[in-house]
């Protein structure tokens, strides 16, 4: 992976500051400096994931309420026992780390976060701990909400405000690239506000898919979130330029309220990205400045070699402080679309949390065995005929159309066969999103009175329980999902919403916990 950091056991910087909780087994919060060391205490065993002595995070922090939950773990509020300072603790269950690649991914996430330590707009990793059951990452707590929250809270919006936000984002990416790191999952949800103060800094978070890179190194695995994935990622040949594309998509959304590449399915979104046709004719684009459109075009150039760099973005006249970005308010429709786009993402997040709990560890393991049994000629790839026969033998009830859909979605390189990674990615995606029982389980979570419909009150109650929405967003969701305009969401409307442009492109690789 071109790592430019030391091994995971050496990644953590030394510190004697108790408030950092730096995971060093030589210091316990609250211990007296004059305390005599324990006699004949056996050394702690070395953890297989982090490669250093295991330590109980609860000896330093009090773990509090759950903040978020994902397929691979839970994020909780935690409090440092000695100082009372609050942090976020991301806990990854070791039983979920079933492959060597999984373990390496966690190690790399820790290495990268320590490598970026001290950068003012990157969430700081305070400590990494490992016990017998889990790995715990204690991080700076960002309590101010997501990127769009600041825009929506102000109630008015200008190109100059968008330029200011984008400048911070690109400065973060420029720093990452200068330090040899590609983020690979840039999206509005991964930029959080440190607090609810108006001048609170914006922080980049979620480095679970990030990698170290060397100049000229080429990556091939498809990772990220569908709307924001660069075309060269889908072609399995990319470098740091892919981050610029993702930020270009964010800029497009900031200016008009919707993504530039849209379709009814993830596969359709990918096709739209590969076509690369960006709409600058629909409202509000005729009223957006020429300078803003010029920057978007340069960031969304389908050829990564011709795409503008982070340094060049920062020197573009539109993004510069007191530059060309006009200070006149953007169309109210842009604000409404932003609210709706954010609200829909939040609704899906809540539903995905329910669905994530439906896919068992046994199902994941079973998918690996399924691939082996389908690959009848042991070629390492399977054809559509092998897929059809294999699914039938497994007793999986899929229609011919669903088999074809699976094949098309999985065959990322378009060569007519799917390899192991493509198969696991696509089948896990189907298990999480398209299986009827999983969707229905999620629907029932919202349908509190079992009436067969989700009312405004039920939706508000469920999302408030998850801490995801305030009341202003409920109307936006209802109006978007409620196809028959009866003021409620029935199962067919819910299922259509869940299947529309699912944002997760590679669930197999993901270890992030959605907050």
Curated annotation (Swiss-Prot):
InterPro entries per record: CDPK_Ser/Thr_kinases (IPR050205), EF-hand-dom_pair (IPR011992), EF_Hand_1_Ca_BS (IPR018247), EF_hand_dom (IPR002048), Kinase-like_dom_sf (IPR011009), Prot_kinase_dom (IPR000719), Protein_kinase_ATP_BS (IPR017441), Ser/Thr_kinase_AS (IPR008271)
Lipidation (N-myristoyl glycine): 2
Reaction catalysis annotation: L-seryl-[protein] + ATP = O-phospho-L-seryl-[protein] + ADP + H(+); L-threonyl-[protein] + ATP = O-phospho-L-threonyl-[protein] + ADP + H(+)
Domain Protein kinase, first and last residues per copy: 61-319
Location of region: Autoinhibitory domain: 325-355
GO biological process: intracellular signal transduction
Family membership noted in the UniProt record: Belongs to the protein kinase superfamily. Ser/Thr protein kinase family. CDPK subfamily.
Protein name as it appears in the record: Calcium-dependent protein kinase 2
Gene: CPK2
